């Protein structure tokens, strides 16, 4: 997260040079984890770089922990109970907890702030060539690059790397931001990959 906030500082400096010109100085955007959130925000607002950077700066300046995960007493107690049950009664309940923290607030924030349909409109208007969000396949060991872009761009497969053409959504950002044991892995990343190929 700290690196993503730093990225916005760099974007503010670039915005000062770019000025109020329409469009976007970055035709290809890529990101992982919180950097993927920044990249998708730039893609969504790529018709107006100044507006995109202003919105990103506003979000990062007002960012709080409860925008990412539930930090209330009830959520922490539920997590302690889930993990305690798994440690002491795991043989009996046959279910492991998915993660230490519940990051559903992050999903809700992204859903409310990002119009993913704007990505196709930006590509069609020529403001954007492609956007890629990379996630790790923890069971496969593959790096999954989910991309949306110009029709000439093709999916790819290399050693431990797969490029998957798709319509980006919140699930891709959550998959990219997953941290083993801390934030839940997104089982949908495998499903999203299989349904896109």
Write out the residue ranges for each language-model feature:
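A short alpha-helix-loop-beta-strand transition element characteristic
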Residues: 66-74, 115-130
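Extended, Lys/Arg-enriched charged tracts that mediate electrostatic binding to polyanionic substrates
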Residues: 106-109, 114-118
């Amino acid at each position: 997260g700290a690196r993503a906030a730093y990225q916005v500082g760099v974007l503010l400096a670039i915005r000062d040079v770019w000025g109020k010109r329409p469009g976007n100085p970055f035709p290809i955007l890529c990101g992982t984890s919180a950097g993927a959130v920044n990249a998708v925000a730039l893609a969504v607002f790529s018709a107006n770089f100044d507006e995109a950077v202003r919105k990103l700066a506003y979000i990062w300046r007002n960012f709080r922990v409860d925008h990412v995960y539930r930090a209330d007493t009830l959520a922490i107690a539920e997590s302690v109970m889930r993990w305690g049950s798994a440690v002491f009664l795991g043989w009996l309940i046959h279910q492991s907890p998915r993660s230490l923290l519940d990051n559903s607030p992050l999903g809700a924030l992204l859903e409310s702030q990002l119009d993913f349909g704007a990505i196709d409109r930006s590509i069609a208007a020529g403001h954007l060539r492609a956007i890629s969000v990379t996630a790790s396949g923890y069971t496969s060991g593959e790096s999954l690059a989910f991309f949306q872009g110009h029709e000439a761009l093709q999916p790819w497969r290399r050693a431990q790397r797969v490029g998957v053409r798709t319509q980006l959504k919140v699930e891709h950002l959550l998959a990219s931001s997953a941290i083993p044991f801390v934030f839940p892995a997104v089982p949908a990343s495998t499903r999203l990959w299989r349904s896109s190929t």
